[in-house]
Regions:
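Small-residue (G/A/S/T)-rich helix-start motifs and N-terminal tracts that mark the onset
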Residues: 1-96, 105-114, 126-177
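A phosphate-binding glycine/aspartate-rich beta-alpha loop in the early core of alpha/beta enzymes
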Residues: 117
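Short, conserved phosphate/pyrophosphate- and ester-handling motifs at nucleotide-, phospho-/glycolipid
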Residues: 121
Length: 177
């Protein structure tokens, strides 16, 4: 069993974000990748990654959310009703959640989500910590640690030499971002 992952995202403007996320999940060895996206993205996604299962009905998404498989929420989402409807389905469920930081900014409160991994770039990290972007650039390691402590999650601070920290141990990816 190589595990399962449910990816939720891909708004009108950013279907490429979910395509990239799903491709990387497959390439990293996830055995079964489910994807919930807007209807207009389904054909684009299946042309690029025919081996994943694309959900096109909210009731099927709700059923999968009850299975407690890990969820990557937010790649390619924007602040709108669709995004908030998904959050309403996810909240107060015991999900293991990987959150795109832009999604966190949209839903405003993550109290009802069990976040395990947070994926911000420097601009998103600055907004989540309520500091200028320049302070994140100046001290990426401490910024990532602060995010991990604030959200009690592993933080993957994307960028040149991506940082991964749980708030105690920090690793730097020297092979690109």
């Amino acid at each position: 069993d190589s595990g399962q992952l449910l990816i939720i995202g891909g708004d009108d403007k950013y279907p490429g974000a979910i395509i990239l996320a799903a491709k990387m999940a497959v390439m990293s060895g996830v055995g079964l990748v489910y994807l919930y996206t807007k209807n207009q993205n389904v054909i684009k996604v299946l042309k690029e990654i025919p081996e994943i299962i694309v959900l096109d009905q909210k009731n099927r998404l709700n059923e999968l959310l009850s299975y407690n498989i890990p969820v990557l929420a937010g790649p390619g989402t924007i602040n709108n009703k669709w995004t908030m409807d998904i959050y309403d389905l996810m909240k107060n469920k015991p999900l293991t959640t990987i959150l795109d930081a832009a999604y966190m900014e949209q839903i405003k409160s993550t109290d009802s989500l069990k976040i395990k991994i947070l994926l911000p770039h420097e601009g998103e990290a600055a907004r989540l910590l309520n500091v200028p972007s320049s302070s994140i650039k100046k001290d990426r390691i401490n910024s990532a640690i602060k995010l991990s402590i604030k959200f009690n999650a592993v933080t993957v601070l994307k960028g040149p030499q991506t940082l991964i920290t749980n708030g105690k141990n920090t690793f730097r990816c020297l092979n690109g971002s």
